[in-house]
């Protein structure tokens, strides 16, 4: 069976050391570090991943690259007296994934658009980069697209902030069912944050 062009691109990203993707990323990230936190890109860096997640090269669809710092929460130190070990500054794990934070920031930057999905494009010791696919739900080309017009319905408004994207559903524990998931539904907060 013959492989498509997208299959070759996907295989290249799976083993970046052997295929030259690592060297290409190393060069690109030098430019990305100088850029702002949210940058609109002309075309996706990983066309195979973008197409698999619903990207189409048409009006009403935008791809932005978002830079988010790595690691746990940057909690501020307490002003009140207590010993350092009890300040709760270090080793604070976030309740959201970095990918989910990237989606929310992209949505805030483009308030007239909705997040379709996102994917990883690179990381170094300090930052991670994700490309977020955004759709304009009121654009005629989206409304007339039978595979994407579901996002124009009112129920999908603000889907990234409500954890309805793929990264959001995963972070809320909705990928699992059965034993061990009793506290995941109806939501994490409904069960006093005992789900995670």
UniProtKB/Swiss-Prot annotation:
Pfam families recorded: Ribosomal_L15e
Region (Disordered): 154-196
GO CC annotation terms, alphabetical: cytosolic large ribosomal subunit
Gene3D superfamilies found in the cross-reference section: Ribosomal protein l15e
Biological process (GO), any one: cytoplasmic translation
Gene Ontology terms for molecular function: RNA binding; structural constituent of ribosome
Cystine residue pairs: none
Keyword line: Ribonucleoprotein, Ribosomal protein
Record family assignment: Belongs to the eukaryotic ribosomal protein eL15 family.
Protein name: Large ribosomal subunit protein eL15
The organism's taxonomic lineage, starting at the top: Archaea, Methanobacteriati, Methanobacteriota, Stenosarchaea group, Methanomicrobia
